[in-house]
Each structure stands twice: as C-alpha cells, then as structure tokens.
Amino acid sequence: MASPGPGPERAVVFFHAHPDDEAIFTGGTMALLAAAGWRVVLVFATAGEQGETSASVGPDVPLAVRRMGETARAAECLGAQRVEFLGYHDSGLDNAAARTTGAGGRPPGAFADASVEEASTRLAGILAEEQARALVSYDARGIYGHVDHVQVHRVGLAAAAKAAVPTVYESTVDREYLHFVETHLVVEATVVAQPERAVTGLGLAAAPLGLSTVEVDCTVDVRPVLPVKRRAMAAHASQIPETSSAMRLPDADFAAVYGYEWYARRGPLGPIDTLT
C-alpha cells in the first residue's frame, strides 16, 4: 500500500450529508487511509437534525447535539484528524408520500435548498486549507436519492473545481453485489426515501440505488478493518441502535454486507486506488 509521504497534498477530504453516512459508506476506507499515513478530514453538510429520535435522547438534548457527539466518537475510531460541519439544516425526506400528505416542506436553511455556489465556496475553503489530494462525495443519485445526498454530489463537484482538487471519488454502492447479500441499511433507506420507486420483483439490480458493477471504478476490501468500521457505526447509536438490522448481523454476514466500499472516480488515479 502506497504511503503519501510528508508534505502537502496528503489530505483526503470526505464530504457527507449526515452523521453516520461516513461510517456506513466510507468508514473502512477512512480507516485504511489513516493507517497508511494519509490525513483524513471529515466534513458534514448538516448535523442530521431530521434523523430518527429515540428514548435514549432526552427532551433536553437536541438531536443535532447528540449526533455531533456520536460523530466525534466515530471519527476517533476511523482516524479522522479534523471534523467540520458546514452549518446547513438536514432537509429531511422529500418523497412522494411526504408531498402528498403535506409533510414535504423543508426547514429554513435546508441543505437541499442551499445555493450550490455558496455551499461549494465553504467546502472549497476547507479543501484549500488542507491542500487536499482528493475529495470523496457521492454519485449523481446521491447513492439512494435523498435530496441532501444529491446536493452533496453537486456541491462536491463544484468545490473540487474551485479548489483544483485533482481527484474526486464518488461514494456509491454496487447494487448488483447487494442483490446477493443480507439487507444493507442503504436498501432500507431507499424504501423510506423513495417508496414510490421501491425494489420490485427484478430485485436490487433494477433498483434506484447506487451504480451497476461495470460503473464502479474502485472496490475497496475493508474487511481487514471491519471491527473498526463496526465500532464507528455503533457509535451512531441514535440512528443505528443495537436492535438495528446492521448491528444484529453475525460477523460473517456483517462482513458480506459491509466489507466492501465502492467508488466511481473523476480525474487521475488517487489515494483510494492505492487500496484496491
């Protein structure tokens, strides 16, 4: 595995929509890069204010505060050396069912409604400070269609161009691979975010989710650091409790579902390619 060596352009910036996305989709990659000597920086568009609530979060503890604390613990597990929040509000769900029932209105400051120019300028400032060698964002679908994830894709591309970041990796999932394993959390999220486009009898291979196998440029085997990834996911206990489908998986099934992470690449080979 190649080491970045000393000096500038040794940072890889991971840009995510909400706390817990980093652990689910890129946690193993982050841990592997950190172990190889890369500076791992984590940036969130929102604090996940519209996430799941639970009895473990008291009425005097705003969910955003709880989730930021969980993020700090997960980031420490994964070796991230800097964590930043851009300060936008979680947009919540924006699916047909919500719009039909009148529940589709977004809160003020929602990331999905933010100016791409403004948001990308904020992110580009961090990329420039870090002299980032690569940026990790999401594919054009936002992996599974959540409006904040789609906005991460747009903002990430614009920010990388502004900061002249050489390589952009777009986190995704290989939907054909997931067709053959136990349910991934992203499949459950797809059903919630887009119930009108839920998985049909054709299975995940035809679902509005991720990319096909041939569209994936980098498949990272993160099984060597899977215990680290699992701890990082568990740190987000407000959203991924012990009773969740992911945390209840036996080790072998967890490895099959979460042991690989997938990326499409824009630009030249970069840090994540050294892991494959």
In which residue ranges do the predicted regions lie?
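Active-site rim/loop-helix segments in enzyme catalytic domains that contact anionic ligands
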Residues: M1-Q131, A158, A264
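Metal-dependent de-N-acetylase/amidase catalytic core
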Residues: M1-V13, A98, R106-T276
